[in-house]
Curated annotation (Swiss-Prot):
InterPro entries: Ribosomal_uS2, Ribosomal_uS2_bac/mit/plastid, Ribosomal_uS2_CS, Ribosomal_uS2_flav_dom_sf. Residues 250-259 have a biased composition (Acidic residues). One of its GO terms (cellular component) is cytosolic small ribosomal subunit. This is Small ribosomal subunit protein uS2. Keywords: Ribonucleoprotein, Ribosomal protein. CDD domains: RPS2 (cd01425). It comes from Sulfurimonas denitrificans (strain ATCC 33889 / DSM 1251). The keyword Transcription regulation does not apply. HAMAP family: Ribosomal_uS2_B (MF_00291_B). Transmembrane segments: none annotated. One of its GO terms (molecular function) is structural constituent of ribosome. SUPFAM superfamilies: Ribosomal protein S2. It comes from the Bacteria.
Amino acid sequence: MVTMKDLLECGVHFGHQTRRWNPKMKKYIFGVRKNIYIIDLQKTLRYFRNTYTIVMDAAAEGKTVLFVGTKKQARASVRDAAIACGMPYVDNRWLGGMLTNFPTIQKSIRKLDVISEMQENGQIDLLTKKEALMLSRQKEKLESYFGGIRNMKKLPDMLFVMDAVKEHIAVLEARCLGIPVVAPLDTNCDPDLITYPIPGNDDAIRSIQLFCREMTEAINEGKALRSGGRDEIVAEDSEEVSTVDADAITAEDFETEEV
């Protein structure tokens, strides 16, 4: 489970410049340093651990978590994290209606499956070169948009979003459908839109990797619980929590980042 050292080393405490912020994030801000907001990592740690448990429990119940992250520095981390825990993902572009108009999205996925099947059984070779090329290009485009959700047969039970501002359409669609959203909250975000917020940097690659890695671990632990390893994992969690108490962390932990 994540520690204060992990958060500091990955730069999770660095927010945006003071001219770019959402006043609703004030309660999560520790101070200012060189016109950069410093996020209160004591709160980050508590929210992180609470959310970790929530995601783990969701996975233990067999729920599906959709990973969303389409900005350049997040794509690979989001995709790899989702694959590592067997969850669907969107890493290219969020198309409006991916949740609220899911039946139409399913039609596009079925079209992708049909073209793939034609390539596998050789039916595509019966077409003209022009027709085969058009289908191949269509498949490539469909795969870039829907490859990560190809096996998602129903709406997800939860979203993990990297950069809630950029992925605001995904967040709004989830809220519209009552789907809970987990997301790191940088200092320019609106915390009211996120069900399970974790105050932290959502731009730095190391910070993104940390968030993704922890979500993957939470989901895999939940799946292990579901398959029967509950007692062993609960014992490990209890030992870890007793080692580092989030409430016991003081301002001294921020000495290297004084404002």
